[in-house]
Amino acid sequence: MTNFEVRQYDAAGRLGELTVPRAGVTVETPTILPVVNPHVQTVAPATLASEFGAEILITNSYILHGSDDLREPVLEQGLHDLLGFDGAIMTDSGSFQLAEYGDIDVTTEEILEFQHEIGSDIGTPVDIPTPPDVDRERATEELKTTQERLEHAATVDTGEMLVSAPVQGATYPDLRERAAADAVSTGLDVFPLGAVVPLMNEYRYADLADVVAACKRGLGEVGPVHLFGAGHPMMFAMAAALGCDLFDSAAYALYARDDRYLTVQGTELLDELSYFPCHCPVCTDHTPAELDAMDADAREELLARHNLHVTYGEIRTVKQAIRSGNLMELVDSRARGHPEMLDGYRALLDHSEQLERTDPVSKDAFFYTSTESARRPEVRRHQDRLERLPVEGEEVLLTEGSSSAQYDESWGVLPPFGPYPRELADTYPLTAETPDRTDRAAYEAAATGVRRLVELHPDVSFTLVHDDWPATALDRVPEGVRLRDLHARD
């Protein structure tokens, strides 16, 4: 767990570096691990590196272990030579096959030793992927088995190969949190969050957000978090904001096989497109009609390349958002692509207290872009800070307008943050950019801040001068506060 270093945070999102000693490379995170099927390579691994900048990929050691055609070649050549890839390679253990078919014929020790023997850089033990919504008894029993296997995996001699510790627990937040803490206790290196693909397939992004948040509570900040099977670019920003560092998926190839075209807003069918809304080489060199007229293999490869361009482009966008401190604005933007993604964003904000713990106290700017912005971690932090700010005098004015000498002290008020001392006006997040037509959620959040301050100082007499706040906001202000409308005539 000493192979991962965080360079920068935004919310729970992390710019980090994962050192993979066996490969001799350091991978910048967040990043995507394209799934490479050793039997069917829609895009060659060497092309993934040269054209898309792939530093790491994932393949299935269980398929290699059981393949009459590939088992001996991979043992003789090694995984890197077999795939033609110089970067880091992670291998899965067969747990996906276990989830799909109910049984596999290999143990954790056998598959880890095989992964080490073929030259894998990051290995995976055989865990039990417990699907969502199973009864608690089953989830608990399977979790116990997974933990026993992880503890056994920690005793296997794998040399420099990193070993992952999958976190299970179905859709029970307390089981996920406990499983995550137990995974950390094994001393293993990478922490995949397992059995979440059904949630993504069913667009249950709110449930996904709750699962990831629970896992993160148990994991803390000890190592890289891998969201198993997450490969659609529309959800990278949300998952990164929750603290996920690694994503993997075969979606780029599987979707291309079905003539599906990835965007950051969702998925389009090729035959329903008249124009390509993308500027990648595939989309600038071809029209949808031209691709549709090609033979199936050529069309599949070009669509897969487009899907990869969009995927890696979104990873770069997420990285820059973390660097610039506007990851939450990006999440907000991506949430508008699908109603279920908006549900996911709102569920993410249910965990704003958790996100606030690693969110930087100062950034370049706060942009209020939707009603959801009123629930961001910065708003919570400002209102928590009221507990530490002194109030001078017995008569205090809280106003969206100018100060008044009639009071012992005058504080400003800025929706959605609420009251603040004037000397903090030029500090983050009070330098926020907010629309002139502020929405109800911002006023209500500001009123919550007013209530917080008033309750902290019961012996002070407060007057609130507001700019036409709605009744739903004013109802949150304590009864003892005198209310005046900024534009009302005396």
Swiss-Prot record:
Keywords for this protein: Glycosyltransferase, Metal-binding, Transferase, tRNA processing, Zinc
First-level EC class: transferase
GO molecular function: pentosyltransferase activity; zinc ion binding
Ligand binding (Zn(2+)): 278, 280, 283
Binding, substrate: 127, 195
Signal peptide: none
Any single GO CC term annotated in Swiss-Prot or TrEMBL for this entry: cytoplasm
This protein's record includes keyword Transport: no
Entry's cofactor comment: Binds 1 zinc ion per subunit.
InterPro entries: ArchSynthase1/Queuine_TRR, ArcTGT_C1_sf, TGT-like_sf, TgtA, tRNA_ribo_trans-like
Active site: 92 (nucleophile)
Superkingdom per UniProt: Archaea
GO annotation, biological process: tRNA wobble guanine modification
Pfam family, one: TGT
Cofactor(s) essential for the protein: Zn(2+)
EC number(s) on file: 2.4.2.48
UniProt pathway: tRNA modification; archaeosine-tRNA biosynthesis
Catalytic reaction equation(s): guanosine(15) in tRNA + 7-cyano-7-deazaguanine = 7-cyano-7-carbaguanosine(15) in tRNA + guanine
Cysteine disulfide links: none
Gene3D superfamilies per record: ArcTGT, C1 domain (3.90.1020.10), Queuine tRNA-ribosyltransferase-like (3.20.20.105)
NCBIfam families associated with the record: arcsn_tRNA_tgt, tgt_general
Matching HAMAP family: TgtA_arch
Biological function: Exchanges the guanine residue with 7-cyano-7-deazaguanine (preQ0) at position 15 in the dihydrouridine loop (D-loop) of archaeal tRNAs.
Similarity section: Belongs to the archaeosine tRNA-ribosyltransferase family.
Cited PANTHER family: QUEUINE TRNA-RIBOSYLTRANSFERASE
Protein name: tRNA-guanine(15) transglycosylase
Native species: Haloarcula marismortui (strain ATCC 43049 / DSM 3752 / JCM 8966 / VKM B-1809)
Gene: tgtA
